[in-house]
Amino acid sequence: MKVMASVKRICRNCKVIKRHGVVRVICTDPRHKQRQG
């Protein structure tokens, strides 16, 4: 899980979602998981 100021999609499998007011990226590749902090 990377905590980034700006979250972006890295590959086409990445999805940007908002969960409890926190922007997250979920992906099939676990290295692409990000959270806005």
UniProtKB/Swiss-Prot annotation:
Keywords for this protein: Ribonucleoprotein, Ribosomal protein
GO biological process: translation
Pfam families noted in UniProt: Ribosomal_L36
GO cellular component: a single term: cytoplasm
UniProt GO MF annotations: structural constituent of ribosome
PROSITE patterns documented for this protein: RIBOSOMAL_L36 (PS00828)
Family: Belongs to the bacterial ribosomal protein bL36 family.
HAMAP family (alphabetical): Ribosomal_bL36
Protein name: Large ribosomal subunit protein bL36
Organism per entry: Bordetella avium (strain 197N)
